[in-house]
Amino acid sequence: MTATYMNSSVPFMYDSYPAVAPERFQGQLQGKTAIVTGGSSGIGRAVCKAFASAGASVACIARREPRLKTLVDEIKAEGGKAIPLAVDISEKDAAKKIVSQVEAELGPVDILVNVAGIARLGPLVDEPEDLDIWWKVHEVNVRAPALLTRAVLPSMIERKSGAVISVSSVVATWPSPIQTAYASSKAAISKFHESLAAELEGTGVLSFALNPGSVESELGAPDDAINTASQHPMLEKMRQMLKSPRKKQTAQLPADVCVALVCDPRCKVLNGRHVEAAQDLSPVLEEAEKEGGGRIGKDRLYLVNIGIL
């Protein structure tokens, strides 16, 4: 089903569609190894299954081992290859340990998808003065993906091939009250990928940030995701919005877009961009392939951008 998005003429998608359909890329990643964080639920779980369906050997990373084992059993039952690694990615040396174990069991890493993330809702003025919980959002949403990226890059650069994708959010580009931690972390990860793509130019390694759309997830599930000590009126509005029965994107949609970004050679023109999973990729690619990148290049679209007079 399609609709419009932010007054854009590009169709707005809620589920997988022909341009990113799994059957397009089935088996294309045979012999490739992928690491996916946040694999025990939601988008991360769907991404693990999508890359396995495309033929990759997948290291499924999350904290909840029973859920990971169930996921890996499902992947194997469907003919795929996967291993579970129960790790808290925010822990010291987690990235090195993950990459070392994956390389030992599955081989060199070709694809990294950073899905794991946490949120924090509440006004900055009501946060504890040490901002420890606030900074934890950046530890998980920015530092951990950066460390994992740093750990996989040397091998990718040496082999002149690879792709790193991190899940960002629409709040990276919109003013988002009571989300200073989450919004700034997502703006940071989108800018991280833009800068990374520039410094990796010519290496064969691709870099993308991805706004998955409005997908049902456990992002706000932890007890400290909402600052319950705050009485800010926006908190109640946010609670009601999160509970509202509005139509959302399926987890399969961003998962399939991740695979398309890696498998479809046309997607190289979006290297370094903040890709919108809920937009039909076909017209976006057509515009990006025009001389100078069309409007996307001229107006610096799909980037965390500050315009000036």
Curated annotation (Swiss-Prot):
InterPro entries named in the record: NAD(P)-bd_dom_sf, SDR_fam
Q: Which SUPFAM superfamilies match?
A: NAD(P)-binding Rossmann-fold domains
Q: List GO terms (cellular component aspect).
A: membrane
MF annotations from Gene Ontology: oxidoreductase activity
For this protein, the record's CDD domains field holds:
SDR_c
Q: Which domain of life is it from?
A: Eukaryota
Question: Has the keyword Oxidoreductase been applied to this entry?
Answer: yes
Protein's pathway: Secondary metabolite biosynthesis
> What EC number(s) are associated with this protein in UniProt?
1.1.1.-
Q: Name the keywords, alphabetized.
A: NADP, Oxidoreductase
Q: Which residues form the active site?
A: 168, 182, 186
Q: Name one Pfam family in it.
A: adh_short
Binding residues for NADP(+), per the UniProt record? Answer: 43, 67, 88, 150, 182, 186, 215, 217
Family annotation (PANTHER family): DEHYDROGENASE/REDUCTASE SDR FAMILY MEMBER 7B (PTHR44196), DEHYDROGENASE_REDUCTASE SDR FAMILY MEMBER 7B (PTHR44196:SF1)
Q: Its family?
A: Belongs to the short-chain dehydrogenases/reductases (SDR) family.
What does this protein's UniProt record list under function?
Answer: Short chain dehydrogenase; part of the gene cluster that mediates the biosynthesis of an emodin derivative that may be involved in black Sigatoka disease of banana. The pathway begins with the synthesis of atrochrysone thioester by the polyketide synthase PKS8-1. The atrochrysone carboxyl ACP thioesterase MYCFIDRAFT_190111 then breaks the thioester bond and releases the atrochrysone carboxylic acid from PKS8-1.
Name this protein carries in UniProt: Short chain dehydrogenase MYCFIDRAFT_6125
| Record organism | Pseudocercospora fijiensis (strain CIRAD86) (Black leaf streak disease fungus)
